Amino acid sequence: TLYIKDDDSRLSFLQGNFITMTNMKDKDIDKMIKYRISPVNISVHSTNPDLRVKMLNNRFAGDIESKIKRLNDAGIEMNAQIVCVPGYNDKSELERTVNDLAKYSENLGSIAVVPVGITKFRENLENLDIFDKDSSRELIGQIKRMQEHFLSEFGRRFVFASDEFYVLAELPLPEYEEYEGFSPIENGVGLIKMFE
């Protein structure tokens, strides 16, 4: 019998899905390390434990950084995703999360920042703002400043804004070489550029 749940690490390895790791116990991480399951695609959203618990509405969500550290220390390759929500994990919280994740740049290939998507199915859910032209431009500027820092520190940009931010901001996409091999393309980073 095949048994795969939505947040199953096998989907991350086999199909490129991003997982929150909220349901992973130490034994699950031990297994990933033992079998060298790599790369692992992680939906981080925030390294602030209280904020991550709130955003994911899951009391087990706060220890993401310790899990990332374990994988990094074992040499497991990872990619990170931050679904950015205005008023929650943007601005200073985004800066904090990216800087926290930069400690694991040895095995963390890239961080993709994508805007939150809102559907009409929001009954009994918290009201969320979405990115507009101005807030998208502000976020792109913030990411470009971080990229400049990481280029000088690591020799690579490390963090990328998804193409959707550029569309919302009504700005041209970055140059082809700025995507550095298009590693976070599953997150919509460089997808439009590939068709130019």
Regions found by a protein language model. Give the residues of each.
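Auxiliary Fe-S-binding modules of radical SAM enzymes
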Residues: 102-104, 112, 117-196
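Conserved Radical SAM active-site core
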Residues: 1-107, 118-146
